[in-house]
Amino acid sequence: MTGWIIYNGTLNIHKINKLVKSLVTEGKKLNIKLEAVKNTEIIPTYNNEGKAELLYLKELESPKFIIFWDKDVLLARHLEKMGFKVFNSSKAIEYCDHKGLMHLELSNNDIQMPRTILSPMIFDYLLNSEDYLIKCYEELGKEIIIKESKGSFGMQVYLIKGKEEFIKKVTELNKRNVDFIMQENIKSSYGKDIRVNIIGNKVIGAMLRESDKDFRANISQGGKGKLINLTTEQEEIALKVHNVLGLDFSGVDLLFGEDNKPILCEVNSNLNFLSFEELWGKSFGAEILKYILEECLW
């Protein structure tokens, strides 16, 4: 069986390249010819009759399935239009890639999350009133988490202390025309969270991530991980989030609320599972491929 794994051709990030290679290697063990394809090596196009097609920069076999390890949502949707089976789906990737959209989609589903405010659309920051900023500041408290709507590995996330710093950061983001969300700071989860790794409708394993140097617990930001057993409540909320967003595989990040109550932090469709694999001692990538094989038999 032939499959593609699509990744971004303009990012030269070692951990992504390593992850792609590991999936290709695991594919060989399962008699899957998994071809690594940069998103810049296939060009989405529409002919004069409006039919979705591809231009190829290299010779490729037609795939039975496509693992989409990128956030090029338009390309993913284009491939779906052409009839390819894409994991994760373009819609699920879109929800996870935009933090505001993720919270919007998960709202009204009885899922605990930090109090969150979406940034308004700004055309000219010079015409923007500070009234809404003051209101947001009063609602969220003196310590506020600001997250750019698009960002990975714990980057583009800021812990803001005080009104002056808050207004300064929001003004800077507005100048750059960046979407963002504003959240209350869950102090009980400072420097620690849980990454729940899910495939299909099953929790494969979970990792406690802790940092004694930063409010973010991401491994990429210097955090350390160890395997843990989830409580029933933690597992239920992670699976619920995963299913509401329609994901095939995901990494759901949970915070610790008061009395260790699980609170959603965010969801990753293109999760970096290498750190988890090192602790687990098994191949998470192989489990993804086994799941896809089962799905492709239907």
Where on the chain are the PLM-derived regions?
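A long amphipathic alpha-helix within ATP-dependent nucleotide-binding catalytic cores
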Residues: 179, 215-264, 286-298
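Short beta->alpha connector loops
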Residues: 69-73, 164, 187-188, 248
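Protein kinase-like catalytic core scaffold
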Residues: 144, 204-205, 250, 263-265
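Phosphate-binding site of ATP-dependent enzymes
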Residues: 155-241
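A short beta-strand motif that forms the metal-chelation/ATP-contact edge
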Residues: 195-198, 260-275
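Active-site nucleotide/adenylate-binding loops and adjacent lid/helix of ATP-dependent enzymes
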Residues: 2-9, 14, 20, 91-183, ...
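Short glycine-enriched loops at secondary-structure junctions
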Residues: 71-73, 92, 209, 255-259
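Conserved N-proximal alpha/beta basic substrate-recognition cap immediately N-terminal to
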Residues: 10-121
